[in-house]
Amino acid sequence: MRKPLPRKYHDKFADDVKALPTENLQRRALHIITDVSKGTLEGKPLEEHSAVGDLSDCRKIYFDERDDIAPRYRLVYRLLPNEVQAVCVEGITVGQRKALAVYVEAARRLGRFVEDE
């Protein structure tokens, strides 16, 4: 097993975690980013989306309080400086997938939201 990568977070990531409606969801979000840094969990790649922007250097992980329901929440992160030479995991945002909200916020935070251009 490799040494865990250092973690860094967007300035508003902690607020995102605190805004999750339950302590269980908050804990799950923090465990997810820890597992990503350890290399024991890997998200699905994101792509460029015409309504959102280019998130192709980011990944997403679906989660919820229980495993027997469709996950309502997403955590968006990226490996820096890139996936091949990763030296750090950056938590971008965490929140509901509803209406692409979490992806719009990720694109905004990275200065890539299409309506902001």
Q: Which ranges hold each PLM region?
A:
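Arg/Lys-rich, positively charged N-terminal/basic patches that mediate binding to nucleic acids
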Residues: 1-35, 115-117
